């Protein structure tokens, strides 16, 4: 079964009124992965979303909490010590940030074939996970 991991920027753009095209694309991706039951996020993604939404997007914390509550149709993966160890290996092997490596580690553990992210190199494979930029058409 096809499984897709959604990086924090997908959730952030879904709430970003200053980026209407990216907002449209992010919302479409969230709807599709939730409807198909193949969307995966991690606690890291939810935590990063809350901080970014309330600080950068100036969304009221209660509103951000309500947005988080709408994510229940996505599988929520809790982080493990093994994820952290694999992320450290990923930093060394792939020369990516620890936080990006932690996303890749969680996606691999969830058996996702793709990570949707704007932050990593689109088209590149990290282990068994391929990165796709869902906003490529918005920035082209």
Residue ranges and their predicted role:
Residues 7-9, 48, 100, 119:
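Acidic active-site catalytic centers that drive phospho-/nucleotidyl reactions
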Residues 13, 31, 51-54, 69, ...:
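Generic alpha-helical structural context detector
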Residues 1-41, 56-62, 138-140:
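Short, well-structured N-terminal submotif of metal-dependent ribonuclease cores
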Residues 2, 76-118:
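Active-site neighborhoods of divalent-metal-dependent phosphate/nucleic-acid chemistry enzymes
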Residues 46, 50, 54, 58-69:
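Glycine/small-residue-rich phosphate/adenosyl-binding loop
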Residues 104, 109-140:
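Acidic, PIN/NYN-like endoribonuclease modules and their adjacent C-terminal/linker elements
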